[in-house]
Regions:
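Extracytosolic ligand-binding ectodomains
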Residues: 2, 7, 11-15, 21, ...
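N-terminal signal peptide c-region/cleavage motif recognized by signal peptidases
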Residues: 24-26
Length: 401
């Protein structure tokens, strides 16, 4: 063999080794499988903080797991990829978003949507596409047989409402109540549930038919009617974070001296910026993580959340739970459940883990059977807050079984 042939063979061999090495290296880089989790919700407009907190929570948890090499399911670590979509609180956009997640992205687990109308609109898409979704909406039919693909991600208004009303009756002597709601199905449903609960407790209903249209900025006409009814308590049913401070401020400017409350979560920054001192005494459902009960893991999450979102939002204490329980349930169900949600569903009734976000040994599990005839709710702590000196102060902590 000539020297030229020898050199040529050595050169070709070198190329082959390089190519094989490159393929091997790139193969090892690609070896880690990706687990996609969708986040579908309202991320713009008056209710934007509801969906954005879902997104930031999922991204925060994903970062923390991915920095440790991923989340282990069946002996294999998966990189967590969050796929967020803004549905703008529009049922049509929610449907197209759910279709994109299930059909194009191959997602089988979705966090959101945030209200009844969008959650109901994606139900057929989730069921047809083999997806489990975790809405923050309270319509009972979403979670009740024959449906089984939706899991309530928070405390519902009809669970928190009666407890808040009873507390105010016992602690503040409240005897009468008026309700005001935005003229949309979600707030109207919450109002109706609240009226029923108030009646059962023996509260006098001063009024419950006053509503305002989406996009309202002048609340004096509607709140004048409500305040003039003379109730001890005004409930802002299903109020969006951008509307709440305007309603509160208007009520106080109309010289309302009683208590204002809602069964939904709110944003203290928006309350302070718009309502200011008028928000003092306002009662709402809080995030499921008060400073008194936070574990070290929750503190770590909160620190990272601030870097991801720019600031802490009290509601993140509730919405941290969605991705955590999805991953933990998949771990127990096995890797096949990543694409087969029926295995996930079979695991849910007996699933239990130590709650990683609160001190002590309290277990985290799926609850809600008393309301939905099946366990289709994350068992997050129920925290009720009162605004005091521009901060949320915890009134009490409860739970739903």
């Amino acid at each position: 063999m000539s020297t030229r042939q020898l050199c040529r063979r050595s050169f070709l061999y070198g190329i082959a080794v390089f190519v094989l090495g490159t393929v091997s290296m790139s193969g090892s880089v690609r070896a880690q499988e990706v687990l996609k989790i969708g986040v579908l919700g309202v991320m713009s407009g008056p209710a934007a903080s509801w969906g954005l907190v879902n997104k930031y929570c999922a991204e925060t948890s994903a970062q923390l797991y991915n920095e440790q090499g991923g989340f282990e399911i069946g002996g294999k670590k998966y990189k967590i990829e969050i796929v967020p979509i803004d549905d703008k609180n529009d049922p049509k956009l929610a449907v197209s978003g759910a279709e994109r997640l299930t059909k194009q992205e191959g997602v089988h687990y979705i966090i959101g949507p945030n209200v009844d109308t969008t959650a109901a609109s994606v139900q057929p898409v989730a069921e047809a596409g083999g997806a489990i979704y975790f809405p923050y909406a309270f319509q009972k039919t979403l979670y009740t047989p024959p449906h089984g693909n939706a899991v309530l991600g928070m405390i519902a208004s009809y669970q928190a409402g009666p407890i808040i009303y009873k507390y105010l009756m016992d602690k503040k002597g409240v005897k009468s109540v008026s309700f005001v709601a935005r003229n949309e199905s979600d707030p109207l449903n919450q109002r109706d549930e609240g009226v029923q609960a108030a009646k059962k407790l023996g509260l006098e209903i001063k009024s419950s038919d006053d509503t305002y249209e989406p996009g309202t900025t002048d609340f004096f006409p509607v709140m004048s009617r409500v305040v003039n009814k003379g109730a001890d308590l005004i409930v802002l049913s299903g109020v969006a974070p951008a509307d709440a401070p305007l309603l509160i401020k208007t009520a106080r400017e109309l010289d309302f001296k009683g208590t204002l409350a809602t069964e939904t979560a709110q944003d203290i920054k928006i309350l302070n910026e718009v309502a200011g001192a008028a928000a003092d005494g306002f009662i709402c459902v809080g995030g499921a993580s008060t400073p008194e009960i936070r574990s070290d893991e929750m503190e770590k999450f909160a620190d990272r959340y601030k870097k991801v979102a720019g600031e802490w939002n009290d509601e993140a204490g509730t919405k941290v739970y969605a991705l955590e329980i999805i991953l933990a349930t998949l771990k127990k169900a096995g890797p096949e459940a990543i694409t087969n949600i029926e295995l996930f569903k079979k695991t849910m009734p007996d699933f239990a883990m130590k709650n990683p976000f609160i001190k002590g040994d309290k277990m985290l599990k799926y609850v809600g059977t008393a309301y939905f005839s099946q366990p289709r709710q994350i068992g997050v702590p129920m925290v009720v807050n009162e605004v005091s000196d521009s901060k949320f102060q915890t009134l009490f902590v409860g739970s739903v079984e």
